Swiss-Prot record:
It is found in: Mitochondrion; Mitochondrion outer membrane. The chain crosses the membrane at residues 25-45, 53-73. It comes from Caenorhabditis elegans. The gene is spd-3. Keywords: Membrane, Mitochondrion, Mitochondrion outer membrane, Transmembrane, Transmembrane helix. One of its GO terms (cellular component) is mitochondrial outer membrane. Residues 46-52 are extracellular. In the first mitotic division in embryos, required for mitotic spindle alignment and asymmetric cell division. Required for motor-driven chromosome movement and homolog searching within the nucleus, and subsequently ensures homologous chromosome pairing during the prophase stage of meiosis. Residues 1-24, 74-478 are cytoplasmic. This is Spindle defective protein 3.
Amino acid sequence: MDQMTVEEKILEHQELEDGSSSFRWLVSSTVIAIGGATVALYISGKIDWKIPAIEAGLALTAGGTITCGYLWFKKRVKTVRKLILQMNKTRSALRKRRQIFFSISMCMPRHRHPSILRACRLTVSAIECLTEETKSLNNGTTWQDLYTDEIREIISRSTVDSQLLKIEEIQEGDNDKMDFEQVFETLISIFKLHASEYSRVVILNFLNSPVFESKKVSKFFETLGRLQELMYNLESVERLALKTETKLSRNERKMDGKMKNKSLLELGWKQQTALALEAILERLESESVTQSEVESALHKTFLVVKAEPAFPQPVKKIDVEVKNQDQKNPEVIVIEKGTGERTDIDMVFEGTPLSEADKLSASKSAVARDVLLDGSEGRCHEASLFGELKMVLEPRRTDFAKRERTALAKFYGVDEHQLEQKEDEETFEAIASGDGEDPDPYDWRKDAEMSAGIHHDANNDDFLKSLKLRRVDDDIIE
């Protein structure tokens, strides 16, 4: 029988199962309803016949048994799929555990870790279970015959202890290159192939069997029971990896089923702290850890605990109301709607759109302010600081002036008093001859005209008045 025929029969079987499921539920519900009504009428005394009541009771029992059996069968046949989902969840839990170790700068040991080794052993047990059953149904041939040497190495059992794997016998010095998480992912892929092969062989045997063989059916359910037990063991590995000792409740399982598409699991601060402390303890047992690494890891663990909010505050949403003052004006003013609380007067603002003339004037004044008046708002503060600095440096100024007069007097060979008289005479002579006249005053209009294109506003009276108000006194600039 070729592959196309097998797929066609599988599709036909699926269609028949979908079409007959509603019919089975309808028959079971009808039988249960008739039996319940008959028993109720018999108890009330309206029916005196005992035989119909007994038959109705038997029908009720049979209908209930069929319904429970159908539900149990439906749950058991999904064991393989649930086991694959549990393997993926366990892999995500182990990966999350490694992320916690990395977050506190602690390397999670890749070799001989109990959780990952336990997961690998359980996966190999599931593969062996499916391989054994496939051989019994397929004349001793399985996909195992196509194993490569690498796959045979990671799937083989130890010769010393059959509960251990062969890769666990590798010495620790040679085991640094062995990543057991990658081995676990490879084993999951191998199990998926064996599960597909086992499902195909079981369906072909049931379809080609001329008579109903109860032995094969019982063997099939026995295999599913073994796989279900392995699934529960993998679930315990997941809880151990995430430090969740209790099983999920019914509502939590529903939420977990809705969130199963998430790649990473959410952990609380307690689980993160427990994993971080366990990582520190494992590194302390090794000889390669230093005191600075442990101190840094403890500090990062403290930050994890401190970052958890004790009482999370609800986020206040701000309602925004958009109002248009004028239909012709495209400018929009955004106003935040309050929550009924008292608003200070300083917090109330009224915005009005600018006209075209105001915009032009504002742009020109902005250019002028950037060119000439930059930093003028802090001139008063700067003047105050400058005055304080002069007072502090006044003793140094007097001392330097005294030392300068002493040096000049020594250079000219005269007394300091005579040197002061000579300086006064030279000053008076310069004033009389006109050499000591003050230079031309600074013309700021010319400087403004030569600056960045603001000569159009150089003769503006408002602009000149504003400059005059911002002028600094000469006694400050000394």
